[in-house]
């Protein structure tokens, strides 16, 4: 009886080298140097120790196109430190995703190229999707989670990318980096008594602050130290020019908000901020509404002028009712002098308020 002729046609090839002590890096280099019908797109090598301690090597090779293998010695590899040659079992890989998952299970791997999603899996159905999403949640970061979903659930990656992107932003949300003031609060030695009293009563942690703190509006010329002073008081949200309440910028654990150089005519959520309101939502332009915990005071910083001053805005005839409300929820201070006296702050004050002229 004739021995069947060896022949494999496949776009993805799975190799197993039993009892093989070749370094996985050497095998990777060896495969890369082979002259093959189609160029490899991705190669992954895994070193696996069986229960008896013997090492095995597995390799997944993805090609640009389908190749035909008739030489069963094509992938025989010689150990770099001796003359021993190791012969692999050669198979076509029906699901490269499943093979890659198998190679990844022990973690002792090396790879080259970009893995090609094949969309096929021997483990079909809902459980496979659940496993994929569980792996994504355990990946540790948004980018890694998206890579897992792209690889294991490519249909969801394409059709649900917008929702996945938004949901993973929330799941792997990192709080904004804390601001470090260039000057301590104590260096501002010309702060009016009314402002100091407001700070003592309202800028406190959640356990000590009032249930509905008062806000404060501070109006004054540029380079009086308003911005740096306001940002030196403690953990805060800084909103300048426009409001970005996304989790990447806005921190619900902050002690207070600073709204700097925002025209009051176009200030979104005017009452929510000035009234220290709790548990409100803000619609975002391209995403889902964000939930704001609230209950913290806001420091409004502005310059004189019709497009900056809150006093001038509230003095408009059509804002009469809003003015009456605002006077019950905030105090209004006009600065005539800088908040500091020392010349040692002049350079940083100038550079800070040149960017934020409020």
Swiss-Prot record:
GO terms for molecular function: ATP binding; DNA binding; endodeoxyribonuclease activity, producing 5'-phosphomonoesters; helicase activity; metal ion binding; nucleotidyltransferase activity; structural molecule activity. Its main location: host cell. One of its GO terms (cellular component) is host cell nucleus. A motif (RCR-1) lies at residues 14-17. It comes from the Viruses. Residues 155-175 are annotated as: Oligomerization. PROSITE patterns: CRESS_DNA_REP (PS52020). Coiled coil: none annotated. ATP binds at residues 220-227. There are 3 rolling circle replication (RCR) motifs. RCR-2 is probably involved in metal coordination. RCR-3 is required for phosphodiester bond cleavage for initiation of RCR. Essential for the replication of viral ssDNA. The closed circular ssDNA genome is first converted to a superhelical dsDNA. Rep binds a specific region at the genome origin of replication. It introduces an endonucleolytic nick within the conserved sequence 5'-TAATATTAC-3' in the intergenic region of the genome present in all geminiviruses, thereby initiating the rolling circle replication (RCR). Following cleavage, binds covalently to the 5'-phosphate of DNA as a tyrosyl ester. The cleavage gives rise to a free 3'-OH that serves as a primer for the cellular DNA polymerase. This is Replication-associated protein. It comes from African cassava mosaic virus (isolate West Kenyan 844) (ACMV).
